[in-house]
Each structure stands twice: as structure tokens, then as C-alpha cells.
């Protein structure tokens, strides 16, 4: 059975919600989805005073376990147009996996969030791609076959690079139905391709 890791970092819960939608998409294909998060780097008292979402039941991933999966779909909010440091820090510890080629041939994909429509969603997802390529992974996005990313009738995230959500500056906007559909589509798309590559 194809095994897919949905690995995320979420300060306020938006990416967490998207991660579980991605996992639903993975499971819709018959593949196994495992949802885990990366460790928090912010001191607990600072996280609490900043109103971070502290009750996230997903277990914390370890670097070594990445080799156990056929595909890895990562999600993290944008920070000034690039990947949040918590996720970047996690991947910066994968040198041993790179040296041994443990991720070569696996599928890599990414999703994100930002406060505004032009807050760096595409640059954040693109920020993951060099890491995937250095590991020898096959990069997969969100194809235009998902028609939900078309049109200008409503505010919505999502691009050919990957699913995304727009949170508003105060975090009050939750992922919309179309954004969650995009996450599910991406999860299913990745799982199907991973199954073919690992056959």
C-alpha cells in the first residue's frame, strides 16, 4: 500500500485544517495517510501569549522517518514570502537522508497559507522545490485539472504550485470549501502518482 506523509507546521490552525483535508484526499485513493507536524521552535510562553493553537493532536515527526514514505506532502504558512522557520529547520536536518539517497524517487509536494492574496503563497511553495530536487524527489503540484483554482468570483487560494488558503491579517478567515477541495485534490493526485512510481 502506498504510504503518504502529510507533514505540517501550523501556528494558528489554518494549515492544520488543510493538512487533514490533504490526508482525506490521499485516503480517497486507497493509500495510507499519516499526518504529523514538525516541532515548534517558539518558546511555549511566547506561543501562548501570541495565541498559537496549542492543542494539535498530530504527533511530532522525526527526520529519520521520512524515508518510510512513498510521498511527502508538506504544509507551512508563509513568513515574509518564504517557508516558516519551523519547517525549514526540520528539513535543514535531513543531510543524512540526502547523503544516503533515502528520498530519491519519492514524491514531494507542498501547500501553504498567507494573510493576504499576495502574501507570498507561490514563493513559499517554490521555496520547497529546491529541497525536493536536491533529495532527488519528483515534484508534484496542483494541476489545472482542479478547476476550483480558476475564476475570480471569490477570494481563494490555490495555484498550479499547490493548494493554499488566505487567512486575513487577524487569522479570522478559515479555509473555504474550494480551498479544502484543492487540498483534497492535491492529496489524491500525489497519492496516485506515488503509487505508480513505487509499483
Swiss-Prot record:
PROSITE patterns according to UniProt? FLAVODOXIN_LIKE
Which InterPro entries would you find in this protein's record? Flavodoxin/NO_synth, Flavoprotein-like_sf, Flavoprotein_WrbA-like, FMN_Rdtase-like_dom, NQO
Q: Which residues form the Flavodoxin-like domain?
A: 4-190
Keywords from the UniProt entry:
Flavoprotein, FMN, NAD, NADP, Nucleotide-binding, Oxidoreductase
Q: Which reaction does it catalyse?
A: a quinone + NADH + H(+) = a quinol + NAD(+); a quinone + NADPH + H(+) = a quinol + NADP(+)
**Entry cofactor note text?**
Binds 1 FMN per monomer.
The top EC class is oxidoreductase
Q: Which cofactor does it need?
A: FMN
Residues engaged in binding NAD(+)? 12
Q: Which domain of life is it from?
A: Bacteria
The positions annotated for binding FMN are: 10-15, 78-80, 113-119, 134
Question: Gene Ontology cellular component?
Answer: membrane
As recorded in UniProt, its EC number(s) are: 1.6.5.2
- Enumerate the GO terms in the molecular function aspect: flavin adenine dinucleotide binding; FMN binding; NAD binding; NADH:ubiquinone reductase (non-electrogenic) activity; NADP binding; NADPH dehydrogenase (quinone) activity
Tell me if NAD is a UniProt keyword of this record.
yes
Which of this chain's residues are annotated to bind substrate? 98
Q: Which family does it belong to?
A: Belongs to the WrbA family.
Q: What is this protein called?
A: NAD(P)H dehydrogenase (quinone)
**What species does this protein belong to?**
Agrobacterium fabrum (strain C58 / ATCC 33970)
Q: Organism classification, top ranks?
A: Bacteria, Pseudomonadati, Pseudomonadota, Alphaproteobacteria, Hyphomicrobiales
